[in-house]
Amino acid sequence: MSLRPNAKTEVRRNRYKVAVDAEEGRRRREDNMVEIRKSKREESLQKKRREGLQANQLPQFAPSPVPASSTVEKKLESLPAMVGGVWSDDRSLQLEATTQFRKLLSIERSPPIEEVIDAGVVPRFVEFLTREDYPQLQFEAAWALTNIASGTSENTKVVIEHGAVPIFVQLLASQSDDVREQAVWALGNVAGDSPRCRDLVLGQGALIPLLSQLNEHAKLSMLRNATWTLSNFCRGKPQPPFDQVRPALPALERLIHSTDEEVLTDACWALSYLSDGTNDKIQSVIEAGVVPRLVELLQHQSPSVLIPALRSIGNIVTGDDLQTQCVISHGALLSLLSLLTHNHKKSIKKEACWTISNITAGNRDQIQAVCEAGLICPLVNLLQNAEFDIKKEAAWAISNATSGGSPDQIKYMVEQGVVKPLCDLLVCPDPRIITVCLEGLENILKVGEAEKVTGNTGDVNFYAQLIDDAEGLEKIENLQSHDNSEIYEKAVKILETYWLEEEDETLPPGDPSAQGFQFGGGNDAAVPPGGFNFQ
């Protein structure tokens, strides 16, 4: 299944806010933000073509394995005879010809889907789906149609337009295990084609009979296929109407306790789609009781499971403080620490940092929990040394923590070394991240100023000195000429507030050079040509 078939247009909350409250600081995911799935995996999940099985894997009705692709051309030569068999009134010829078509459509590479469609047999296969008296023929026809629907959108459209979808939904109640399983697979392929096709399948009432396949008596192959199809029912943008997919939540809560990696993977992806949205959707996911197990799965050895579990947790903490607290209370912070500090791939670390950034956008108790879990030090390490995509997310995590944190929490973060890497990112190419880092530094400077006012630091803003020592002052000065007006204005404001007064105090009384700089908050303030320079 493709995670990004349609461009998400959601903008990060709190793009350039000066003061960040918990709601503003949380950020929904952007489409291009976390590239965590290989295209091969995306494609195989969106649609699956049923290929030939070994003799010991064949379902009850599959009489023989698939021919080698080298015989395809020879098979196509006999296409007229196969078509004749399909349209015959002879039951055995119908089955034999349909089976030949199924084999042809099941070859490993480039099956001749277009040629089969052009042969005009699709309506006949759909008709065969209704043959309750002949489940073996139903099965072969369903398999052939499944593989046609695994092709292009145009191929899928042909299957839909010949009326197969409502019949496949009816076949979910078939007496035959194999027919039911093939119907599940076919519906997964149709739903996986596009949100429009997904909604068509849901509109035919497919969800409830699909969920009934997920029982304790189901074979593993059925569990895998039904869970995969369920994930396709939940996938895609625009999202399906939540009321249509909400009934899947109790089943997903059971499925994430499976020991099978494929079932776990697709169940977690389904939860990641359902939790990607408004707080009421997030609340429904929480109330389904999935959070404890999702947190456990953050330590799963397989990235295929870990990634969608992390995505789900990350989505949940975009909710309100209570929803975020549910994740914290179930021990997610220690798992996130492990993801930051162990040798996980870039995409996982990036996703973990994004998740933490939404936790640090919470209240002070939640920021304290992040500090006590030991997350600040590894965040600083990533902020300093990781690839830029990870640095960006770590910068959000630190900046959000400074926005909502107490003075003591900010002092702790400074002690952990946040100042230098924040300063270093002021020269990065991303204006949003420059702004995020400026906000973080400004929040730190405010605490330093408060300490200075109380006389605790000998009339010196110790944090301003730290920023200067980290070459941050020079970088802030240079931002006065930045193309982005918000960055320029913020840089000027920081320089006015935390360095100009210091410069003024060093000038001798009556020094004429002080006359043009009336910046004490008056409206007549003017920035000197070229900006401030305090070096």
From Swiss-Prot:
PROSITE patterns: ARM_REPEAT, IBB. One of its GO terms (biological process) is response to salt stress. It is found in: Nucleus envelope. Residues 20-46 have a biased composition (Basic and acidic residues). Transmembrane segments: none annotated. ARM repeats lie at residues 67-106, 110-150, 153-192, 195-235, 237-276, 279-318, 321-361, 364-403, 407-446, 461-500. Residues 1-58 form the IBB domain. Forms a complex with the importin subunit beta-1 KPNB1. Interacts with A.tumefaciens VirD2 and VirE2. Binds to SWO1. This is Importin subunit alpha-2. The gene is IMPA2.
